[in-house]
């Protein structure tokens, strides 16, 4: 099981995956917004999304788990 974590303090702007989706290494899974900049969050390995831990509008801190992959 792998996790995708936030690299910065931000707000979740858009979630691009849902539970059960298959993602490949490098796919963008969500977009964060910080200081009016859009920050793409990419999968660092391939897998199936088992849980999306956040929803649009949520505030996240550096290191928060955003998505879990199987």
Task: Name what the model sees in each region.
Residues 1-11, 28-44, 69:
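Short beta-strand-turn/beta-hairpin segments enriched in glycine/proline and small hydrophobics
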Residues 8, 12-18, 22, 51-54:
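Short histidine-centered loop motifs in beta-beta connectors
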Residues 18-29, 56-65:
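Short, well-structured beta-strand-loop connectors
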